Amino acid sequence: MAIDGRSSSKPFSRFYLNSFEEGRVTRLEKVSLVGHGPPHEKSYISDATKNKSVWLSEKEPSLPRYQRLVVLRSLFHALLLRPRRSFALLCYSCAAPTRTNSKMCGAQLQIEQTNASSGLVRVIGRWSLVALMVNTMIGASIFGLPAVIAAYLGKWSPTGYFVAFVGISVIAACMAEVASQFQEAGGPYLYARAAFGRLVAIQNGWLLWLARVAAVAGVANLFITYLGEFFPIVKTPLPRAGILAALIGFLAAVNYRGVAGGNRVSNFFTIAKVSLLSFFIVTGFFRLLLHSDLRVTPQSVNATASDWFGALLLMVYAYGGFESALIASGEARDTRQDIPVALFVAIGITTFLYVAVQILVIYTIQNAGTSETPVVDSARRFLAPLGVQIIAAGTLVSAYGYLSANMLHTPRILFAMSRLRDFPAIVGKVHPVFRTPHISILIFAAAVYLFAVAATFRWNAILSGVARLFVYGTVAAALPVLRKKQPTADAFRLPFGWLFCFLGLLFTGALVVRMHRGELIVIALTSAVATLNWLWVRRQQAPSEATN
C-alpha cells in the first residue's frame, strides 16, 4: 500500500479527525516509542473537543468505556458538521486494510502526535513546562546571589526581588502573547523572524544561543567549585576536565535518545531542587520564630541608583531562563493554553523561593554581603551538621538540574534556525530512531564543554546576562508588530498590549545603558558573526532564486 508516494510493506489504515469545527482531516504522522526504538504507526481517531486519542485496531483489546464514548461522540460530531467528508473518510478507512499487530519492544508505548512539519514529538505538558522554567531559572545562582544582592541593597534586598519581579513579569506577559501564536520550535528566534525578518532573527538566535551556552558553562564551573568542597582533587586541571566531560556528556546522551527521557530528568531535578529549598526555607523560618536569639540585624547599606541598577541586572540574570523553555514549544502539547499559564506560575514560584531565601540569609548572617556561600552559612545557624551537608549537596543537585533543563531546550535554537534555512541543513536533522535534533544537541554540548573548560564563571555570567537583555527587548518589540501582521490570529491576547510593549522596552533599555564597555564589545562581536551568517544565507539562496 502506498501512502503519499511512499511504499509500505506493512499496509495499515490511518485516519485522523482533526478539528471537526473546521472540517479539516489530517493524516497521522508517526507515533514514537520515545527512547525505546523506532517509530510505530497505528490507526487512531482523535476527539476534537478534548484532544484525546484512541487506537482503532481489529486485534487490540477492547476499548474502555470512556474511550468508546469518545469514539462515538467524535463520529457523531463529524457526521453532523461535515457529513460528506466524514462519509468519504469512513469509507476509506473501512476499505483500507488494518495493520496487523506486532510485538512492542520493552517499555510502555507513549502515544503522542508528532509535529507534522518538524518530526518532533509533542510530549511536554503544562506542568512539565512549569518544571522546565523553574528548573532553568533556579540554577546555582540562588546559592550565591543572596550575598551579592545583600552587598548592593542590604535590608532592602528582598524588596529588590519584587521590583525585578514586576519588570520580568512585563517581559513574560509580552512573551505569553507572542509565544501563543507559534507551534514550532525556536522560541524568541522564531518570533523575531516572523516580526522583523531574517536579519534580526539570526541576530536574535545567535545572541540567545550564546546566552544559554555561556550560562550553562558558568553553572558547570560552579558545579566543579561546589564539588571541590567534598573532593578537592576535582579542582585540578585534568580531573576538572574529566568531570566536566562526564557531566555534560551524560545529559547530552539522555536527550540524544529522546525528549521524554530528557523531560523526565528535568522534572526529577526540579522536584529535588525545590524540595531541598523548601526544607531550608521551612526549617529556617520555623527556627527563627522559636529562637529569636538566632536573628541578627540586617546589614544597613545606603543604596544609590547605581546600586539598584546593578542589583536589578543580577536579578534579571537570576530570573533568566524562562524564555529558553519556549524554545522547546515545538514539543509542547498545547502552546496557546499552556505557555501563558506556565510562564506566570513558574515566575511566581521562583520569586517566592528567591525572596524567602534572601530573608533567611540577611536575618541569620552578620554582614551577609561578604559571604561566599550564603545559603550554606545560613544553614549552619539553624541546622545540624547533617542538615548543612544536605543543603551543600542540594547545591550540586540545583546546578546539575539547571544543566539538564538547558540540555533539553537550548539545542532547539539551532534546530529551528536550520529548519528555516538560516543555518546549515545538517543541524536540522531529526534522528530516525529517537526523533530528536541529535546534531544540534551534540553541537550545544561541545560548545558548553569548551566554554566551561576555557573560561571562568564570571566571564560566562556577564556574557549571558548582557545577551539576554537584547533578546527580551526584541520580543517586547515584536508584540505590536505581530498584532498588525496577524490581527485575527488564534492566540492569547494581552490587555493593553502596547503599554506592556513600552514598559518592556523601557525596562530592558534602562539596564542596557548601565553595562560596561567590555560587555558591549562581546555583544558587538557576536552581532558581527551573526551578520556574516546572514550574508552567507543570502549568498546560498541567491542561486536558487535566480533559477526559479
Please describe what each predicted stretch is.
Residues 92, 101-156, 162, 168-173, ...:
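Membrane-interface "cap" regions at the ends of multi-pass membrane proteins
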Residues 115-120, 157-158, 162, 234-242, ...:
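Helix-loop-helix junctions that connect adjacent transmembrane segments
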Residues 122-133, 197-210, 244-247, 302-315, ...:
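Select transmembrane alpha-helical segments in multipass membrane proteins
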Residues 148-152, 160, 169-248, 252-256, ...:
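Hydrophobic transmembrane alpha-helices that form the core helical bundles
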Residues 190-191, 197, 228-233, 342-406, ...:
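TM-loop-TM module centered on a large, flexible mid-protein loop between adjacent transmembrane helices
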Residues 238-290, 302-304, 343-347, 464-474, ...:
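Membrane-interface loop-to-helix entry segments
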Residues 423-431, 476-493:
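Alpha-helical transmembrane segments
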Residues 463, 467, 496-548:
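A generic transmembrane alpha-helix motif of multi-pass inner-membrane proteins
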